[in-house]
Amino acid sequence: MRLWSWQLLPYLSDLQFKGQLREITAIMRDWRDKETTNHLLINRVMDYPKGDLTSYFLLYDIEYGNRYHKQHCELATEFVNFSKGDHFTVEPFKGWHNKEYLRVCMANLYEKHFFGIGKSRITDEEWQRLCDGYKTITGEEYKI
């Protein structure tokens, strides 16, 4: 389980992007129903207000609309109800989703590009899109 840096959402390959919806939804439902998450890579979400996870979902859903021209209205309602009036933010998980975390995400995505097999592999074109996105976000070329 992993939450990609919210800044990478517009640049993720379709496979990684669509998989992110399953991750966000599973995290929200575990937190809501079990009052906890149980995965090393995402447990930090609980250090933030629930509104940050809802904000992440809303940023995801905007990008989803840009890509596929539809939205997740029922799921959006579920997220808003989950956050129970917490404030939303345009930069969710501030302090965690920083440049260092962005680089960790890029390294993980590079591994999927370089070592990936079959459908899970990130193609050269998809990798270039991620590198271009990294440069847009940071103003720097991505270096491994």
Give short role names for the model-derived ranges.
Residues 1-144:
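Sequence termini and other peripheral, non-core segments
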